[in-house]
C-alpha cells in the first residue's frame, strides 16, 4: 500500500544496492517496532536495526491514514529517522515536521503545482544537519529545478488552499454518493 514509483525505487534499485527493505503495516505498531528494532524476520536475519522508516501520511492507492507522531516515535526510539511523504495531504492540511518527522517529501507535480505543467518534488528537513546531507546529495546528483519550473510551483501554491478545500468538498460528495450506491462494494475515503 505505497505509491508504485516508490515501490519500484525501493525494490528495483535500493535492494540491488544492498539496502534492506522491509515492508510493514504502519498501523500495526508492534510489527513496526519489531521491524525497526531489527527483531523481525528480515531485520533480525541481518542483525541490524533500521536506519530509516519511510511512510505516506495517506497511502497510495488505498488512502490508509498513518499517525505521524506514533510512527516517528517508534523510529526515534530505535535511532532511525522518519521520512514522510505528505503529497496527498499537502502542507496546507498537515505539517509532519511538527509531528516528529525528520524529512518530509512532496511530489510538487501533484497538488502543490496543481496544473500538470511541472515535474518536481521537494524535500523539507527538520534541522541543519539533515539539510546539509540533502544538499550534498542534491549538489552531486544535480536534482535542481530550473527557475521557470520553480515559478510554476510558486504560482500553484498561491491557489493551493482554494483547490484543496474544493477537492475535499468534491471528495465528500462523491464518496457519500458512492457509499449509498447498490453496485459499489467499497469506498476508500479517509474523511
Which residue stretches match the model-derived regions?
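Conserved PLP-enzyme active-site core in the AAT-like
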Residues: 1-183, 188
